[in-house]
A protein has these predicted regions:
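N-terminal leader segment of winged-helix/HTH proteins
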Residues: 1-22, 78-80
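Short, locally clustered residues in the helix-turn-helix/winged-helix DNA-binding domain
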Residues: 5-8, 33-40, 109, 136
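Charged, amphipathic alpha-helical coiled-coil/dimerization segments
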Residues: 12, 43, 73-133
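N-terminal helix-turn-helix DNA-binding core of bacterial DNA-binding proteins
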Residues: 13-67
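C-terminal regulatory/oligomerization modules of transcriptional regulators
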Residues: 42, 48-49, 126-150
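Short, hydrophobic-biased segments on the C-terminal half of alpha helices
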Residues: 54, 72-73
Length: 150
């Protein structure tokens, strides 16, 4: 039992090793990817304030406030993300993906595409098709349950 968790742990470790050259972690990469996808979906220019707040990240990733605060603090210290005070409510800060953050997100994503291809080479063509079909079904089921897609 627990094979999915075991695979998750191994993939996270492999991802963190790969991301060392970008000086970010898997969790930080996920936040950068989320902000980049959100900017693209809303036609927000990189470096411009978005309508994404810390609370959105907490809900989307199922993380606690202190965890997301720590992730954002580290990303901000690396100049990958900025926080912008929201004019309508000064307690809220909008998140901004910096150009540097966007570039790291783009470069690191290319490596994940390659990593995925290498992992799938473990299987024959037929096994790959079945495996991807099963993963897509699982993803769709979980995404509906949580009401999001990534």
């Amino acid at each position: 039992g627990g094979i999915i968790k075991k695979i998750e742990i191994l993939l996270t470790a492999k991802s963190n090793r790969y991301l060392q050259k970008f000086n970010i972690t898997w969790s930080q990469a996920q936040i950068l990817k989320y902000l980049a996808m959100h900017a693209k979906a809303t036609n927000t220019k990189i470096g411009e304030p978005t309508d994404v707040f810390q609370k959105d990240l907490e809900e989307f990733f199922g993380l606690s406030n202190p965890t997301v605060t720590g992730l954002l603090n580290r990303l901000e210290a690396k100049d990958l993300v900025k926080r912008d005070i929201f004019a309508q409510d000064r307690r809220w800060k909008r998140l901004i993906l910096t150009q540097k953050g966007y570039e790291i997100q783009e470069k690191s994503f290319d490596g994940f595409v390659k990593m995925e291809s290498e992992l799938l080479e473990t299987f024959s063509k037929d096994e790959r098709e079945i495996f991807i079909k099963c993963l897509n079904s699982l993803y769709e089921s979980l995404a509906k349950e949580k009401n999001f897609t990534f």
